[in-house]
């Protein structure tokens, strides 16, 4: 989580590369990072207000991808503890690396615009763990529901919509790379549930419903923050890689219905009406 008030637990969100052999192996594993058209974006045509908003947006995106990497790592451990099918685990195992790549892409995009903005966070609250009193299978179910059936499933159409609207080659290439990686993330939750549901105890569907509702409640809070943002000219936003607030919220509402609520209903999970409406 981020914090506007700096408490003793808060740390500045900063990133670094170790370099040397570790970086070379990383570059060989994911050469697409260096293949981006870095250095092609001239920030001078944009107003200071637009640039600051863009830097803040991409810094926040880097932090959110950092959080998602932590959530992926926690979910991977839960899948292994639950003895999920080996091919399911193997397919998932690349997701943490995908997210680390996305962290670097977003952070470097912020640097292209003049540098990241100050962001304080509590490392101990980076991502939520599963309820330790649950069985390994139910812990995995809780994390997959939160992070993939809701979180990743909802984020992918929003990323895709932003990619479609990005007009400059650099943010368009970055968003395109993220969208391609996230395609597998978006379907994983449903693949897992199709395997796990027949194995879950009677309390399993209720756990899925409660977890989805709590996650959507947090997303509704984020949407309320988006609604309060001052509007920027759509052309400016599109060039640097984001949507206007109203456009974003409309797409978010549609995506919640089609990418989250409908697949849950198809599997017999019906959420309370308070969680089925858009922003």
Segments from the language model and where they lie:
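Non-heme di-metal
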Residues: 1-279
């Amino acid at each position: 989580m981020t914090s506007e008030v700096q408490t003793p637990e808060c740390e500045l969100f900063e990133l670094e590369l170790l370099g040397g052999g570790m970086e070379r192996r990383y570059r060989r594993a994911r050469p697409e990072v260096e293949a981006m058209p870095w250095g092609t974006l001239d920030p001078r045509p944009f107003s200071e207000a637009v640039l600051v908003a863009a830097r803040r947006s991409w810094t926040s995106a880097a932090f959110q991808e950092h959080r998602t990497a932590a959530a992926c790592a926690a979910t991977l451990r839960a899948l292994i503890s639950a003895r999920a099918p080996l091919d399911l685990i193997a397919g998932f195992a690349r997701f943490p690396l995908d997210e680390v790549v996305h962290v670097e892409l977003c952070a470097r995009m912020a640097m292209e615009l003049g540098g990241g903005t100050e962001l304080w966070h509590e490392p101990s609250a980076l991502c939520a763990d599963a309820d330790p009193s649950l069985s390994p299978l139910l812990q995995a179910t809780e994390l997959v529901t939160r992070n993939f059936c809701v979180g990743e499933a909802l984020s992918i159409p929003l990323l895709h919509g932003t990619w479609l609207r990005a007009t400059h080659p650099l943010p368009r290439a970055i968003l395109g790379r993220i969208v391609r990686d996230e395609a597998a993330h978006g379907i994983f939750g449903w693949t897992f549930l199709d395997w796990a549901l027949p194995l879950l105890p009677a309390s399993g569907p209720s756990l899925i419903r409660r977890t989805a509702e709590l996650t959507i409640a947090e997303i509704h809070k984020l949407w309320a923050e988006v609604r309060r943002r001052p509007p920027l000219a759509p052309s400016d936003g599109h060039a640097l890689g984001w949507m206007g607030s109203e456009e974003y919220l409309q797409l978010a509402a549609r995506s919640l219905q089609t990418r989250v609520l409908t697949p849950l209903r198809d599997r017999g999970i019906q959420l309370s009406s308070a969680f089925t409406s858009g922003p």
